[in-house]
């Protein structure tokens, strides 16, 4: 359905697009589409553009994002190793809300979306919403076989009086900022570089689940974070800062399996 999260509405799935139109069909939108894994500096550059357009034209800002990532979807159906992601999807939603986006539209990447041609995506998704400004990344592709590109969207926009632009490549130290570069940095434990590319320290959250409570037997509190069907790009033992209800606590994190107790499930 539609959920209000700290002044940002989350629309979950195309099946709720008609409900969304009933509630917000009177609004005009400044929008973007992408995966936005990590919400790094390049993504923030796009979000700044749609927020500026929304403020100038009295539009509402809207971000379409897909879950799972296409590479995760194909890895799951082929039983391959799941590719790592920078942050869980709930963290992504939280970051979009904190960044001041008005609406986040979650598109489930499933067989139906996978088979949708670029023209069908435009008709079934974009034309259902009163978009007046659309900004995409310079490498954005969409639709079946990734056949849709900026030129197709630009031609569509011109025919509908919709301004469609592609962001310029956002670079750091001469290299294009990308989720791939950040994953590589995290896998090499280069947290300083990853933080620069993200524009903030690398963080993640997860649901605390009960373990074997072995730490409690020796006076050391522990917490197991469950990461459902998601692989983070970091593995090993790290010194960390934990945020517990607003209180920061120093701690140690074991990322991956629990080797000391023969664990086989990633935590």
Label the predicted regions.
Residues 112-221:
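Classical nucleotidyltransferase
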Residues 211-267:
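Phosphate/ribose-recognition catalytic cores of enzymes acting on nucleotide-derived substrates
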Residues 44-129:
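Core alpha/beta nucleotide-donor-binding catalytic domains of modification enzymes
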Residues 5-33:
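Positively charged, low-complexity intrinsically disordered leader regions
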Residues 32-50:
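Di-metal (Zn2+ and/or Mg2+/Mn2+) metal-binding site signature of metallo-dependent hydrolases
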Residues 40, 96, 134, 194, ...:
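Residue-level signal for inorganic ion chemistry
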Residues 32, 61-65, 166:
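Structural beta-sheet core signal
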């Amino acid at each position: 359905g539609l959920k209000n999260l700290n002044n940002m509405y989350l629309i979950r799935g195309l099946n709720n697009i008609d409900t969304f139109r009933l509630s917000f069909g009177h609004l005009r939108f400044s929008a973007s589409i992408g995966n936005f894994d990590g919400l790094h500096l390049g993504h923030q550059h796009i979000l700044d553009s749609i927020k500026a357009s929304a403020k100038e034209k009295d539009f509402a800002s809207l971000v379409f994002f897909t879950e799972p990532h296409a590479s995760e979807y194909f890895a799951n159906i082929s039983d391959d190793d799941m590719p790592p992601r920078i942050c869980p999807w709930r963290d992504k939603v939280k970051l979009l809300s904190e960044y001041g986006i008005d609406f986040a539209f979650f598109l489930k990447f499933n067989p139906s979306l996978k088979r949708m041609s670029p023209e069908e995506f435009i008709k079934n998704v974009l034309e259902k919403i009163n978009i007046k400004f659309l900004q995409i990344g310079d490498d954005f592709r969409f639709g079946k076989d990734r056949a849709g590109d900026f030129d197709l969207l630009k031609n569509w926009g011109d025919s509908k009086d919709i301004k469609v632009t592609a962001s310029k490549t956002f670079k750091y130290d001469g290299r294009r900022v990308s989720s791939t570069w950040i994953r590589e940095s995290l896998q090499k434990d280069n947290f300083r570089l990853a933080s620069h590319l993200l524009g903030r320290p690398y963080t993640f959250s997860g649901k605390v689940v009960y373990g074997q409570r072995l730490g409690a037997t020796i006076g050391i509190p522990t917490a197991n974070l469950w990461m459902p069907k998601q692989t983070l790009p970091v593995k090993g033992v790290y010194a960390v800062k934990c945020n517990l209800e607003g209180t920061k606590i120093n701690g140690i994190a074991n990322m991956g399996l629990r080797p000391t107790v023969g664990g086989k499930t990633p935590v």
